[in-house]
């Protein structure tokens, strides 16, 4: 999730009220929440964004309007409730995307195209190959800014400690150009695992509140759609998953990138919600089921047994909370002696 998102949204609402506006919140999450009204409201509630807390109505829906065709020939769909408003203010974190590299990645433009596109717009956008995704976002965002009443956007940047380090209001006319500048700054703000080589990586949890892909491939280097990365990534053979966050509401997207999962992960996975997400972004391998272990101990035994050419008496194991929380990690004695002493 975005640090301080409730406070940022509330401050924006209060500012608009001071100007005489009567703001309301529109869920802008593409296929998240299963792509349903109820699911989207549940996700917002999980982040503390409720009508009572924000003091304004919240509109969740799937109805869209067709704004036209982008350069790839695909229709650009946009949330009807937002389109019929007098002014739209997108709020999002600008960061490196999990599936592609480009001048535009995750940010305000993606919020306009994917988030406010709802399930229909999200699926249409993902007709584009990821190698062309950044260009698609730019062309589609340009069309949306031209056709819809976008006023300004609130861009959020976070540092390696998951803390807000930059907050900026960007007029619609400068949104695309300014976001490109902010994306360049993201690389130096991103955390990474400072280990060169391991046998096994244990991840305690994945979830939509951690990353749109469940976990950030920029940190762990596993993806079904991308090959290049901008950050240093440890070399390892097996990856284990122990849990799915409660805030993910059963969405276990990303589970398919692991080699071994626990029964707890399998039991918490809501297949309908996970599959809806996987189909919307056309990454169905991200939802496949790996080998299932009873618990963490059995998962590690399976991982060790399936590794090749390792020293079983000096196992190199990394354990992290998730790809957002990297301030502290656990490493086995072999890694500690080799890389930190």
Predicted regions and their residues:
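Short acidic, glycine/serine/threonine-rich loops at helix termini
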Residues: 7, 35-41, 69-72, 99-104, ...
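A glycine- and small-aliphatic-rich helix-loop capping segment at beta-alpha/alpha-beta transitions
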Residues: 8-16, 39-50, 105-114
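Short coil/turn connectors at secondary-structure junctions
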Residues: 19-22, 53-56, 72-73, 83-87, ...
């Amino acid at each position: 999730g975005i640090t301080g998102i409730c406070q940022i949204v509330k401050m924006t609402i209060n500012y608009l009220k001071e100007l005489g506006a009567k703001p309301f919140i529109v869920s802008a999450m593409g296929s998240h929440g299963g792509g349903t009204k109820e699911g989207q409201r549940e996700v917002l509630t999980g982040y503390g964004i409720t009508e009572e807390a924000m003091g304004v109505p919240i509109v969740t829906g799937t109805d869209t309007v067709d704004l036209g065709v982008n350069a790839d020939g695909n229709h650009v769909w946009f949330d009807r409730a937002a389109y019929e408003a007098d002014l739209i203010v997108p709020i999002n974190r600008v960061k490196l995307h999990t599936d592609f590299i480009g001048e535009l990645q995750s940010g305000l433009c993606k919020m306009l195209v994917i988030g406010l596109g709802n399930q229909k717009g999200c699926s249409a956008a993902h007709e584009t190959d990821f190698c062309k995704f950044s260009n698609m976002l730019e062309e589609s965002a340009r069309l949306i800014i031209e056709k819809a009443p976008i006023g300004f956007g609130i861009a959020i940047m976070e540092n390696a400690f998951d803390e807000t380090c930059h907050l900026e209001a960007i007029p619609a006319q400068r949104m695309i150009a300014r976001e490109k500048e902010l994306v360049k700054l993201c690389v130096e703000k991103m955390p990474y695992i400072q280990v060169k080589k391991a046998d096994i990586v244990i991840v305690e949890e994945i979830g939509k509140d951690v990353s749109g892909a469940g976990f950030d491939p920029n940190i762990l280097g596993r993806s079904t759609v991308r090959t290049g990365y901008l950050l240093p990534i440890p070399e390892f053979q097996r990856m284990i998953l122990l849990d799915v966050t409660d805030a993910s509401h059963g969405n276990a997207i990303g589970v398919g990138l692991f080699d071994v999962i626990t029964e707890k992960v399998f039991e918490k996975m809501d297949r309908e919600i996970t599959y809806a997400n996987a189909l919307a972004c056309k990454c169905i391998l991200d939802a496949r089921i790996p080998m299932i272990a009873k618990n963490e101990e059995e998962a590690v035994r399976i991982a060790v047994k399936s590794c090749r050419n390792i020293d079983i008496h000096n196992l190199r194991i990394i354990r992290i909370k998730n790809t957002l929380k990297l301030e502290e990690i656990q490493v086995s004695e072999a890694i500690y002696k080799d890389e930190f002493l």
